[in-house]
């Protein structure tokens, strides 16, 4: 991959060829100056922050109003009013787990003055454009509003905060404790208590000391290998898990149809001055939130006296998550810390609306919600639902037959507005101390990254993490009777963090932050086989690195067959032991060693370049089935997400590598299983496709931006151009913090402007970054005024006093 050539070509194109500037709107010297670059990205210049944030909301609404409206409705639970009863269950879950307007307003009232004022101004900016659009709907309302025959509403601070809190809560939310309990209960029924617990401890380990970490430290923690404190749960947990699981599947499906972001992942890297080839700190961002058109991320430049920042953030958020200000670059990835607990509530046999807590029967809080639902005939009806809440949180399942209910607690509950404020403060910070102060106020589980002009870097696993009762196993639900409540929260200073690490860099792909840190029910995310090794390997293979080096590492990670990292060498070693018995084994060894472990298509012929990749894919699937299908039998389906997880297959590696496990998973030599899979797959490929690997090449898998439909029509009308599938960030920023400020390159596909005219015409910037993204080309990261003016295509002004 000729990344340096590609990067230089696009930057050369942007800066050498003159732009035809268009001056539009009011006098460009008044109000907020809006400079649109040649990719449609708005760079806002205001005389004060209030005007700046109002303009921020305005341009976002101008570019993405329909998307904003979908986010608002999706998060407040009013989608069924527009799209009918199929979306009522999604609305119900949004209301069940959400807050009332009164509760949100109370949180906003508790914020510091500046964040509170600027959130309000951001909302005013959105409403300003809504007012304009309602006066001129034919020109200023995008086609979707006309198509579905409804109008946007004005926004308030409550809407802005709700969009943030509900979407971020979903990223932190899970019901894995119920799923784990279901797995354990079914294993116990089949194998008995002793054997099932050994199996469970292998499937959902507490702490894997071999797991790669973002903070490199000496020594290893002790491995937790037994379930000495497993609490006894009701048999009703199986039914509850299945019910909640189906509800969540429906929620995910309908949310994706509406174009709401659900996928959360992300990778990032920061490099300090000692590891950087230029001596300047470097930062890479790769948020993974899915691929749709318009995208979930919105790029903008913000400029006011004493404040300059450029980057991207989620649509509807009044802050930048991936970018830089004058002093430092910042990024974030999902932390996957243990911030969600499920509590098993014991119900009163005489009154199922009461639950036992600290020796007394308590009444559940009861709340009625009304939904306006559009019928098939277009008429609207009112549907009323009753929701219950315990001291632990909303009731997500209630089994009156077994007198058990399950409620859900989030450690950050009630502090979401504070977290939004903390992110805004991080944007405004001028040094590491101020950034760290903002990080200390953030209560949801993320990883934050910092790289400044001095060459310093820092990493924080931010969030508010409970101190749980030591008698409780965090992997399954907690009895809600009051004896096992949280004892407080871990102090921020004890959260994993590092400043200027000795190895000179920090990388993360949602992996374990540090050796001692565990994440309860999601412990199987952090194992010995983990995808972050792609970034670690790339960094360790190089001395000092540049942004181009980091881009090459990201390219490798995006196309890697992740199982090849550990399992390919295991296969080669076993083949080498048996090569004298079959000449095909020598051939396989040669091809495996030649293979770069990537599933790429550099010659653009529609097939993966390496035929051996087809062999390895099929070998892995065959091998995985042999390891677990017989032992787990009927439970293979509910455990496959763990044993063949997208982050890694650690249990399989431990078995095949003959490491210690609690349960004996195979009764034959591991090498025999490896060879059986090899022989079966080799015979199949050679008989069906030919003797040599060149004949085994597979058609590439493709992806599109916006393949999920919105009631039969692509979300935002999508962009159906297929490109090769990549395990890559939804956008990428590569930033070098030079002594004079940030520079670098970035890409935010498919494009900046999601507005579609009433007649179906799309903007030139609807998907103009899509092909670039597919070809690993980038646009220059524009920060200083001189470069922005060179790339300017349109200049206008917004008068905030009107």
Curated annotation (Swiss-Prot):
Changing residue 657 to S: In strain: CA4098. Residues 1-24 form the signal peptide. Heterodimer of an alpha subunit and a beta subunit processed from the same precursor. Changing residue 3 to M: In strain: CA4098. Its EC number is 3.5.1.11. The gene is pac. One of its GO terms (cellular component) is extracellular region. It comes from the Bacteria. One of its GO terms (biological process) is antibiotic biosynthetic process. Keywords: Antibiotic resistance, Calcium, Hydrolase, Metal-binding, Secreted, Signal, Zymogen. Binds 1 Ca(2+) ion per subunit. It holds the Pfam family Penicil_amidase. Ca(2+) binds at residues 177, 341. It is found in: Secreted. The active site is at 266 (nucleophile). Changing residue 349 to T: In strain: CA4098. Residues 235-265 form a propeptide. This is Penicillin G acylase. Changing residue 569 to P: In strain: CA4098. Changing residue 254 to S: In strain: CA4098. It is an enzyme of class 3 (hydrolase). The keyword Signal applies. InterPro entries: Ntn_hydrolases_N, Pen/GL7ACA/AHL_acylase, Penicillin_amidase_A-knob, Penicillin_amidase_dom1, Penicillin_amidase_N_B-knob, PGA_C, S45.
């Amino acid at each position: 991959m000729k990344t340096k050539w590609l990067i230089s070509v696009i930057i050369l194109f942007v800066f050498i060829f003159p732009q035809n500037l268009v001056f539009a709107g009011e006098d460009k010297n008044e109000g907020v100056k809006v400079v649109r670059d040649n990719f449609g990205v708005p760079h806002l210049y205001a005389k004060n922050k209030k005007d700046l944030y109002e303009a921020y909301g305005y341009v976002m609404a101008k570019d993405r109003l329909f998307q904003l409206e979908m986010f608002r409705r999706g998060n407040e639970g009013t989608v069924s009013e527009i799209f009918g009863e199929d979306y009522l269950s999604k609305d119900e879950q949004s209301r069940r787990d959400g807050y009332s307007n009164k509760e949100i307003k109370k949180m906003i009232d508790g914020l510091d003055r500046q964040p509170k004022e600027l959130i309000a101004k951001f909302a005013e900016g959105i409403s300003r454009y809504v007012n304009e659009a309602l006066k001129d709907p034919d020109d200023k309302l995008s086609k979707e509003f006309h198509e579905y025959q409804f109008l946007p509403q004005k926004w308030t601070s409550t809407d802005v905060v709700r969009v943030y809190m509900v979407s971020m809560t979903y990223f932190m939310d899970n019901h894995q404790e119920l799923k784990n309990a279901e797995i354990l209960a079914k294993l116990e029924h089949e194998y008995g208590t002793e054997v099932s617990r050994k199996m469970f401890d292998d499937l959902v380990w507490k702490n894997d000391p071999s797991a790669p970490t973002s903070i490199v430290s000496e020594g290893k923690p002790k491995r937790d290998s037994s379930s000495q404190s497993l609490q006894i749960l009701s048999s009703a947990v199986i039914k509850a898990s299945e019910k909640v699981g189906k509800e969540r599947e429906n929620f995910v499906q309908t949310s994706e149809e509406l174009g709401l972001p659900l996928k959360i992942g992300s990778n990032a890297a920061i490099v300090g001055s000692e590891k950087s080839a230029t001596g300047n700190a470097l930062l890479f961002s790769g948020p993974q939130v899915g691929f749709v058109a318009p995208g979930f991320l919105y790029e903008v430049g913000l400029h006011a006296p004493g404040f300059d920042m450029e980057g991207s953030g989620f649509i509807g958020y009044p802050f930048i998550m991936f970018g830089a200000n004058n002093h430092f670059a910042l990024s974030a990835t999902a932390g996957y810390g243990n911030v969600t607990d499920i509590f098993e509530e014991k119900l009163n046999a005489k009154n199922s609306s009461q639950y036992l807590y600290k020796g007394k029967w308590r009444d559940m809080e009861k709340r009625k919600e009304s939904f306006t639902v559009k019928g098939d005939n277009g008429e609207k009806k009112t549907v009323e639902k009753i929701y219950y809440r315990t001291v632990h949180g909303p009731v997500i399942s209630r089994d009156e037959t077994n007198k058990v209910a399950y409620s859900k607690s989030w450690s950050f509950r009630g502090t979401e507005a504070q977290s939004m404020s903390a992110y805004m403060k991080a944007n405004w910070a001028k040094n590491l101390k101020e950034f760290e102060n903002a990080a200390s106020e953030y209560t949801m589980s993320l990883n934050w990254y910092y790289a400044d002009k001095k060459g310093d870097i820092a990493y924080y696993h931010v969030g508010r993490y409970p101190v749980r009762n030591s008698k409780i196993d965090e992997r399954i639900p907690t009895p809600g009777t009051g004896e096992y409540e949280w004892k407080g929260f871990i102090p921020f200073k004890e959260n994993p963090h590092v400043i200027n690490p000795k190895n000179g860099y920090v990388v993360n792909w949602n992996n374990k932050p540090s050796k001692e840190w565990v994440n309860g029910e999601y412990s199987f995310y952090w194992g010995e086989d983990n995808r972050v090794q792609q970034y670690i390997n790339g960094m360790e293979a190089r001395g000092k690195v540049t942004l181009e080096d980091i881009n090459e590492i990201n390219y490798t990670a995006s196309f890697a067959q992740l199982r090849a990292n550990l399992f390919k060498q295991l296969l080669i070693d076993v083949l080498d032991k048996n090569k004298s018995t079959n000449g095909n084994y020598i051939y396989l060894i040669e091809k495996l060693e030649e293979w770069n472990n990537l599933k790429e298509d550099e010659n653009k012929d529609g097939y993966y370049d390496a035929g051996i990749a087809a062999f390895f894919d099929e070998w892995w699937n065959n091998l995985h089935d042999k390891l677990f299908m017989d032992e787990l039998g009927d439970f293979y389906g509910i455990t496959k997400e763990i044993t063949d997880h997208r982050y890694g297959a650690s249990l399989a590696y431990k078995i095949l590598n003959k490491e210690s496990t609690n349960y004996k998973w195979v009764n034959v030599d591991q090498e025999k299983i490896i060879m059986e899979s090899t022989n079966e797959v080799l015979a199949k490929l050679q008989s069906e496709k030919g003797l040599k690997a060149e004949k085994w090449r597979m058609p590439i898998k493709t992806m599109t931006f916006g393949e999920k439909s919105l009631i039969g029509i692509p979300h935002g009308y999508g962009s159906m151009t297929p490109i090769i599938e990549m395990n890559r960030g939804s956008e990428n920023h590569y930033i070098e913090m030079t002594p004079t400020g940030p520079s670098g390159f970035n890409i935010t596909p498919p494009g900046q402007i999601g507005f579609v005219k009433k007649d179906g015409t799309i903007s030139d910037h609807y998907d103009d970054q899509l092909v670039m993204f597919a070809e690993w080309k980038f646009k220059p990261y524009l920060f200083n005024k001189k470069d922005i003016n060179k790339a300017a295509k349109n200049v206008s002004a917004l008068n905030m006093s009107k």
